[in-house]
């Protein structure tokens, strides 16, 4: 076994799997452009207090899962980002983006870090794609980010998805509900697990989000947040549902749904996949108008967004066989060197083809012609271009279509011209 191994909770992604990542990323980039979202990239680390203020001190992320350290000369703690929304909002406020354009539609595909117990689809270094729509508080804006997310899933071919949605109301609604929930849970306090006891004091709504079956049994008859909502939140939620229905997006109302981050208000949603088993969450999001105030803004910034775990997304697609038709990019031409002393001339041909925009490779190991052909077939090259003394003397090269086995002789300029025409090169004369 090699002396050095990959760090626990991280993983290597090799070329065969990179092909799958590129496919998914390509769909995301294409649909983001269709919806008018622009890509943003933020630093992988931020000051720790950014996440303490935004995510919430009662969350598992802040309490247990952040990678924090003290490299800054000022003594301020820095944290590898565990989520993207806080950093995106920080960047938007710092750059004053909304002054330039009152509506900002941003998306990202980024690396994140959490001290989680490594398991399938959950690593300590992981990737998310997501979107943030800033500057608009309307239900149509919430429906827009959900529609974008679901459109990505649809274009990727995913089946067995369920969109669960709820409203968390505004701050006053949640205060009334927190009081009612604490009153309900107080007689059961000693039966709560340690995490739920801590949440009881800081944010009892998080107990509803517990994955502990015993906690789920305790809260199954708890008051429903929906019963404590004011007219404003109810009307807002009904409009979100209306827009989703109008766009043909099926959903399931789940009054127990709360998100694991404290900054959400009004609409919250989550998407699950039947392909992921018991840990079925694929992604989710919601509205977070008050986040900007927590980060020092003088007023609220209307905002909605979502995040989806890329690793979990790929696992769901793999289990549904959605990558079976993907083929690695194959070279158009594999240049076969027939005599070792002709390598330099063959390399010049490869360079000429590449500069003409034609994908071309050459064997760099000095192997036999038979071994070169085997390598060309292994790489699924479309054509083999034979370079020998006879070919160089005549100024022509023999080109063989490796799929049809048809071949003919061509001047190099002819080969380049054929690749530039709409008809494929492999239509060679017998």
Swiss-Prot record:
CDD domains: HisRS-like_core, HisRS_anticodon. It is an enzyme of class 6 (ligase). Signal peptide: none annotated. It comes from the Bacteria. GO terms for biological process: histidyl-tRNA aminoacylation. Pfam families: HGTP_anticodon (PF03129), tRNA-synt_His (PF13393). One of its GO terms (cellular component) is cytoplasm. Keywords: Aminoacyl-tRNA synthetase, ATP-binding, Cytoplasm, Ligase, Nucleotide-binding, Protein biosynthesis. Its main location: cytoplasm. Gene3D superfamilies: Anticodon-binding domain, Bira Bifunctional Protein, Domain 2. Its EC number is 6.1.1.21. GO terms for molecular function: ATP binding; histidine-tRNA ligase activity. Homodimer. Belongs to the class-II aminoacyl-tRNA synthetase family. This is Histidine--tRNA ligase. It comes from Chlorobium limicola (strain DSM 245 / NBRC 103803 / 6330).
């Amino acid at each position: 076994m090699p002396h050095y191994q990959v760090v626990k909770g991280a993983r290597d992604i090799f070329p065969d799997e990179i092909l799958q990542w590129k496919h998914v990323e390509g769909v995301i980039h294409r649909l983001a452009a269709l919806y008018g979202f622009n890509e943003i990239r933020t630093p992988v680390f931020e000051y720790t207090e950014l996440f303490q203020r935004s995510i919430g001190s009662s969350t598992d992320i802040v309490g247990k899962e952040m990678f924090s350290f003290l490299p800054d000369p000022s003594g301020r703690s820095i944290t590898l980002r565990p989520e993207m929304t806080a950093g995106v909002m920080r960047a938007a406020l710092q750059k004053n983006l909304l002054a330039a354009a009152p509506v900002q539609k941003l998306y990202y595909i980024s690396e994140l870090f959490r001290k989680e117990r490594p398991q399938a689809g959950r690593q300590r270094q992981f990737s998310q794609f997501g979107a943030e729509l800033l500057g608009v508080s309307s239900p149509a804006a919430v429906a827009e980010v959900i529609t974008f997310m679901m459109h990505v899933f649809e274009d990727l071919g995913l089946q067995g998805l369920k969109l669960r949605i709820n409203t968390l109301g505004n701050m006053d609604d949640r205060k009334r509900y927190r009081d009612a929930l604490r009153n309900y849970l107080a007689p059961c306090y000693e039966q709560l697990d340690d995490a739920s006891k801590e949440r009881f004091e800081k944010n009892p709504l998080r107990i509803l989000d517990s994955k502990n079956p015993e906690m789920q049994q305790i809260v199954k008859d708890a008051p429903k947040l929906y019963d404590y909502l004011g007219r404003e939140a109810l009307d807002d939620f009904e409009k979100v549902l209306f827009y989703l229905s109008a766009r043909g997006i099926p959903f399931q109302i789940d009054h127990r749904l709360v998100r694991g981050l404290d900054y959400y208000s009004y609409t919250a949603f989550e998407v699950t996949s039947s392909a992921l088993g018991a840990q079925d969450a694929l992604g989710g999001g919601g509205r977070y108008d008050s986040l900007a105030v927590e980060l020092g803004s003088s007023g609220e910034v209307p905002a909605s967004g979502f995040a989806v775990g890329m690793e979990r997304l790929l696992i769901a697609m793999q289990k549904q066989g959605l990558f079976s038709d993907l083929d690695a990019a194959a070279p158009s031409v594999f240049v076969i060197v027939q005599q070792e002393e002709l390598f330099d001339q063959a390399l010049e041909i490869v360079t000429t083809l590449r500069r003409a925009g034609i994908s071309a490779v050459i064997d760099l190991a000095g192997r036999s012609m038979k071994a070169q052909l085997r390598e060309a077939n292994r790489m699924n090259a479309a054509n083999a271009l034979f370079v020998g003394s006879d070919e160089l003397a005549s100024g022509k090269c023999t080109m063989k279509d490796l799929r049809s086995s048809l071949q003919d002789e061509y001047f190099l300029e002819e080969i380049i011209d054929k690749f530039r025409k709409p008809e494929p090169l492999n239509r060679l004369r017998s």
